Every structure is written in structure tokens, then in C-alpha cells.
Amino acid sequence: MKKKLLAGAITLLSVATLAACSKGSEGADLISMKGDVITEHQFYEQVKNNPSAQQVLLNMTIQKVFEKQYGSELDDKEVDDTIAEEKKQYGENYQRVLSQAGMTLETRKAQIRTSKLVELAVKKVAEAELTDEAYKKAFDEYTPDVTAQIIRLNNEDKAKEVLEKAKAEGADFAQLAKDNSTDEKTKENGGEITFDSASTEVPEQVKKAAFALDVDGVSDVITATGTQAYSSQYYIVKLTKKTEKSSNIDDYKEKLKTVILTQKQNDSTFVQSIIGKELQAANIKVKDQAFQNIFTQYIGGGDSSSSSSTSNE
């Protein structure tokens, strides 16, 4: 699951409840035994230096800050729709997937909501930066729709064999795709797919190769990163249709806006800067030295800023 803003290793409840214990109190007993107990405060002192606990506290802070600032602008239906999509994707395994990630349905909903609140904030800032220069840059880099047939394979030697057949005179590329491609979404349609430079359906290497082809041209074997770590997949592409790019930028204005905003959402540095600004505006104050550095990736040292200061008040 993408964009995990809430950690699952330690529950939000444990850190939230234990952090509320005053320093002068042991709090309630969590465990009792013959001749001894383990109190909330004792447990808190043990877990607060754990990186997972610190990540949870960071995520809780982000959640609260963004909920206060943008919560009224986010419809719960957006969260419910995402949950519905995940349930459809994972089917009867959904609860098991959540459990393996250390989450319940409710904590997953909270995670998704926080992620969408951050996306909303990023979108607002990005829209304010939609300058003519940004549009021109996006236009220069944009390639409109092409239609191609693709064959995806998991073995390079097999890909070379199929390529030889694909480049033979009179080759039926569509049939080769049906017989050999591992791409279940396109193989039954002869490998046909339409995409532009902003599409995410095919790897960047495949798009680049396709855009360089003439109509009816067939690429060499293209190596692209696979879906599993350290794996590769191999593509053969035949270009069947090419759209001429208009010289009028206004013809693509809405598309270019989407491209620019998507790039901003995927720019981790930009996203971190937005989170940092919101945290600073919220005047974050760290009350326990154990957590003084949890905001450094967003707003620098936890004890070096008045908006993210360590305090024992």
C-alpha cells in the first residue's frame, strides 16, 4: 500500500495514551504480578526511544496539524472509495494484508485520510505555482498520444527469440503478443495500448523507445525494471499510430496542468517542504527530549527553532 503515513509497528493508542501520563506520576498499572507491577509511565519510558514509536508520534502530529487545517475540505467518501478499491484489489485477503502491515481497518482509514489531506495541501500550493514558465516547460517535454502494440516477457533470451519473429517479413505482431506476452491487460487485444508521455501504464524506457519509432516500426528488446525488487522485464514495441503535436500550447493546457500537479505530488522534496511549513505554522513544541529530533526531516533540528522547540513546561 502506497504513501504509508502511519506506522503499524506500534499502535497509535499506546503512544498517545502513555505520552499523556504526567512525569510525576506512574500512571495506571498495565501489568500486575506477584510483588510487582508495570505502570504506564514505566512502559512509556521504555518505548519512547524506539524508532517505531517516534515515527508514530511524528505521524500523529502530521495527522492532527493537517486535519485542523484541511479536514473540512476532505469528504469522507474519498477515503471510503479508496478502501473499496483496496478491498476489490485484495479480495478476501484484505484483512490479512492489513494485519501483516500492523493495521486495522480504522487505522488504515486514518492513514488514507492523512495522506489525502497532505495531497490536498500539496495541490493547493502547486496550483499557486502554475506559472507560464511551468506550462512551457511541461509543454516542451510533452508527447501526445501514440498507439502501439507491446509484448512483455520475463526472460531476455525468450524476448530475443520473439523479436526475431516480430521483425520477420509478414510477421503478425498481434498474434505474437497473444501467444507470448505476459501482460494480461493487453495481450488479448494483440498488445494494443494508447499512451502519452504522462501515462503510467508502461515504463519510461518503453515510452521513450515508442516515441522514437516511425509508424509500423518495431523496437529492439527494451529492458525495464520489473515489479519485484532487482527484477527486469523485457519489452518489444510496434508503433501503429502517432498523433502530431500541435504548436498551440492552449490545446494541451488542462493536460499539462495535470502533468505539473502530478509531478509535484511525486516530488518528495516538494511534499516535505509543504509538511514542514504546516508544522512550523502550527508552532510545534517538543515536550520530551526523546522526541526532539523527530521533525528534523521537515523543519531542521527539534531544539533549534522556536516553532519546533524542546520544552519542559
From Swiss-Prot:
Chief site of localization: membrane
The keyword Membrane is assigned to this record: yes
Residue positions of covalent lipid attachment, annotated as N-palmitoyl cysteine: C21
HAMAP family, sorted: Foldase_PrsA
Every PpiC domain range: 143-241
Biological processes per GO annotation: protein folding
Function field: Plays a major role in protein secretion by helping the post-translocational extracellular folding of several secreted proteins.
Compartments, record wording: Cell membrane
Keyword Cell membrane: yes
Family named by the database record: Belongs to the PrsA family.
Protein's UniProt name: Foldase protein PrsA
Catalytically driven reaction(s): [protein]-peptidylproline (omega=180) = [protein]-peptidylproline (omega=0)
Lipidated residue numbers (S-diacylglycerol cysteine): C21
Membrane topology of the entry: Lipid-anchor
EC number: 5.2.1.8
GO molecular function, a single term: peptidyl-prolyl cis-trans isomerase activity
Organism: Streptococcus pneumoniae (strain Hungary19A-6)
Cellular component aspect of the GO annotation: plasma membrane
Signal peptide (residue range): 1-20
